[in-house]
Regions:
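Non-cytosolic membrane-interface motifs at loop->transmembrane helix junctions
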Residues: 4-6, 65-76, 128-140
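Membrane-helix boundary connector in multi-pass membrane proteins
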Residues: 94-104, 117-134
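Juxtamembrane "helix-exit" motif on the non-cytosolic side of transmembrane helices
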Residues: 28, 58-65, 118-127
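Membrane-water interface at the C-terminal end of transmembrane alpha helices
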Residues: 21-25, 92-93, 144-160
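Core segments of alpha-helical transmembrane spans in multipass integral membrane proteins
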Residues: 43-59, 74-91
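Hydrophobic transmembrane alpha-helical segments in integral membrane proteins
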Residues: 1-21
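Membrane-interface helix-boundary motifs at transmembrane edges
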Residues: 27-42, 95-101, 129, 160
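Hydrophobic alpha-helical membrane segments
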Residues: 82-86, 104-120, 140-147
Length: 160
């Protein structure tokens, strides 16, 4: 039973963190503007999720590749390092200023668009509909790409 729960949580960590960001932004008692709070919590959740994914690409490349429906590649190490790097910067941004968050949001949005394109391409041309290639993770990636810049711009507008 415990093993199943742990497996479920670890296998669905990005989705759980995504939902938790909205809940925490809603219940956090803070005078800050809601989009700014949500931006912070989403960046923290994205940071943890990217660090987690990067760790798997680096330490367990066979497991990471098979969950996406891909073959193991030497490039997994590079994407793992990129994921861990932006993950750590996104985590740090939770405690930093809006000016610090801006470039993090920009990078995450552009990177997410590229990642989504790659996963769509694999689904369309290679028929790869694995859950971690063309499932909820892809949906969350697309939402991050669109929502993070909107929240950032709303927070900047309110601050101005």
């Amino acid at each position: 039973m415990i093993q199943n729960v742990v497996g479920f949580v670890l296998g669905n960590l990005p989705a759980i963190l995504f939902i938790a960001a909205f809940v925490l932004a809603a219940i956090t008692r803070s005078p800050s503007y809601f989009p700014a709070r949500l931006l912070g919590w989403l960046l923290l959740s994205v940071g943890i999720a990217y660090t987690w994914a990067g760790f798997f690409h680096i330490a367990f490349p066979h497991m990471a590749a098979s969950s996406i429906g891909w073959q193991v590649s030497p490039f997994q190490f590079e994407i793992g390092v990129a994921d861990v790097s932006i993950g750590i910067v996104a985590i740090v941004s939770f405690w930093r200023s809006l000016d610090f968050k801006g470039p993090v949001v920009g990078y995450l949005s552009l990177f997410s668009i590229g990642v989504a394109y790659g996963h769509f391409r694999e689904a369309i041309y290679e028929g790869d509909y694995s859950k971690n290639n063309f499932g909820i993770l892809l949906g969350i990636t697309l939402i991050h790409a669109a929502l993070l810049p909107v929240l950032y711009l709303l927070a900047r507008k309110k601050r101005a």
